[in-house]
Amino acid sequence: MSNDERPVPDISISTAKPSKNPLGYTITYHGNGLTFADGNSENEIVVNSSGKILSGQYKLPGNTAVTWYLDSQCTSKIETDNSGLPLSGIYSDLDLYAKPKTFLLKGYNSSEDYNEFFNLVPSTATSIVFTDEAMPTSEALIDADADGDGGVVAWMDGTTMKISTQISGQKIIAPSNCTLMFFGLSKVLSINLSNLDTSNVTTMESMFYSCMKLTTLDLTPLNTSNVTNMSSMFYGCRNIINLNLSPLNTNNVTDMSEMFSGCSGFTTLDLTPLNTSKVTDMSDIFRGCSKLTNIDLTPLDTSLVTNMSGIFANCSKLTSINLSPLDTRNITDMSYMFSGCSGLTNLDLTPLNTSNVTNIGQMFSSCKGLTTLDLSSLNTQKVTSMDYMFSGCSGLTNLDLTPLDTSKVTNISGIFAGCSGLTNLDLTPLNTQNVTNMSYMFSGCSGLTALDLTPLDTKNVTSMRDMFSDCSEIIKIDISTFNTLKVSDMYEMLSGCKSLISLNLNVDTSNVTTMTDMFGYTTYDGEDKHCNKLTLLSVSDKFSFVGSNYNLPAGTWYASDGTAYTSNGKSCTIPNNKADTYTRR
């Protein structure tokens, strides 16, 4: 029989790597930089195909929880049970490499501007608890782990969201950036931070922002020793009545802007625990704390602060503020500082050092309770903006502007807007040589019957929009001393001047592009804001009406030579660029 005729036996060839142990499969656990309790860097066990350990004992390296990987670079994770056995089963010898679990919680995604943990909180959650208890196997996993090693798990227990390490005594590690962590959780009634380690956190910006249903918040578990940013941390937590700040270590904090803004439930606030020696920004820190009746600023070190914009804004129940503890020598921005402090009846500005301040826009806006305001202590040599500085100060009956140095001011729009209690206003002290914006300057000064405008230097002004709007009692306005070569906007300039009889517009309007509703209009709810009593109008040879809706009062206007011109209440036939005085009768 030849070789070709010999029968070929049926042989099955296995390519599987044979086990190095005849009893079963060997799993070698590599410490991968960690050492096992016996001092070795490796530990072996032998198991059979059903997962029964035949020899050896599973151990954890380094006395810490680890995640096992199929490679030493720890890129290919393998899920194991509590005995260290792969959940996928065992079919050959295995080498597993350890990597310590970090227990790191998901955090702020700066590139997308959202907090990944916040996005995990179900809309049904009414409480949040950080714990170390084991997750029930019956509950659905919420993956709250930052690096995928399974160190942090979360689940819902009724309406309570629990976040856990599942290892007794092991805390969850908060990410370094906790911005927006609990942002806008408007249904959450309580947050238990007991098992959250914040020792590595540097930013707590907007951490509890608009947690409107919180009535209490225990800050004791928080380690804030490395935090530099607490901006808007408790913003809008309007139902918290009292907040104990004593657990907070603020030694390294530089930004406290809006920290308590909108905490309208606060009736008291003890600032004693706060170390503010490194803080540079306190803008809006107490804004909207509308139930505070008193605030002791003594504990605050403000020697490095540069921004106090809106610091007391809308603290409407404060009747007085002792500013003596404040060191303001480095402040550049005091805009909105007392805005909306409608309960203030007196305000001593003497303690304020304003030598470096450039912005005092809206500084006293809507301080309706002030009847007098002594400005003599203010140094405004560097100020460039005074927009709406006294707007809405309807209680002021007199205002001495003598102390104000306005030589560098460019914006005084709305500076006296709504000062309805003023019956007289001396503008002589104002140096307006650099001012470009006078819009709304006297708007709503309904107590003025006359106003001497000759002190105003308007050569650089571009906007006179609504400049005298709603000066409802003023009888005569003469702007013949105005240089209006740069003015482009006279929109609604005189609207609401219901008592105005005489108007001198002996100015140059060659660059004005809008006069819409200059002489008034009718509001949506039917209020008539036209200058219906205007009967005397003087114009220059460089004055021209712009557009067709400036709304000069309707009627017949007679020139000095008796020539009659008409206005239909929108536009008129009075000739442009012809100096004359017109009388309506």
Q: Which residues fall in each region the model found?
A:
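Predominantly extracellular beta-rich ligand-binding scaffolds that present long acidic/polar faces
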Residues: 490, 515-518, 546-552
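Secondary-structure capping and domain/repeat boundary segments
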Residues: 2-101
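Short glycine-aromatic motifs
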Residues: 34-35, 63-66, 125, 240, ...
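Structural signature of tandem-repeat unit edges
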Residues: 43-46, 128, 158-173, 186-202, ...
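Short beta-strand elements of solenoid repeat domains
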Residues: 206-210, 232-236, 258-262, 284-288, ...
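Short aromatic-glycine motifs in intrinsically disordered, low-complexity regions
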Residues: 53-63, 516-522, 526-528
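Surface-exposed intrinsically disordered loops and tails
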Residues: 80-84, 527, 568
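N-terminal capping/linker segments that flank leucine-rich repeat
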Residues: 3-33, 94-184, 193, 505-508, ...
